[in-house]
């Protein structure tokens, strides 16, 4: 008999829609506190053009790059951190409600004396949710702490998973967890820098960014919507390249087809803009989580991986 988790992996709730229009924004933040008006304008434009889900980059609310001259509570990310819900979420709620859209944007989130690198999710019916980055990268650890909980957003298209930048590129466990729990769409809010005009900058960025996102599509048979910063943010240059990827064709006759397709966007898109595509989520078949017709059980083996990770955790703890 299948467990509740196994049933959730393979089942599809009744009434779930397949067709969804997703918009990702190449967004150039003004360093500091002047971005919410422009986020709202972009959200209204995308939603007015039919977008159901609108995605902004990591730290879109304030800008990403820290000022090395600032320390302690004077750091921009700490000074401008907001609660979720908070003022910026409230500013976007009318847009989400009017257009029936979901809006996702990155910000420094304050919860008491703690600050997180977060993605806020504004839902059309008024819910406001927060995903807190599980793996802060490098200098981010000087102003934020680790999140502890994945976020699956309940939508008319089934559960949608949220991740932020380093979570997506170096830790494939998060995307796999979401796909195993039924997500057919993964949202990546990112601030991935690169100097595309310098030496092998474009090649390195493409290998790290596009190759990794495409790998998630192939490995998990889900769609990925990635929104990146663009332009000069304080002293760091961001290349944009926001894009939407997904399975290219339906699997047929029991044959595997590890093909991916870029539905919208390009690695060379380096200007501020909205990039949108209408997706058929029925292509996200997530075959490895379903019963293999030759064995009667899924190829996906979480009980095995749990044992392996317990061994790794014990080693890391010095046991």
Residue ranges and their predicted role:
Residues 21, 104, 118, 149, ...:
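Conserved beta-strand and immediately adjacent loop positions that scaffold enzyme active sites
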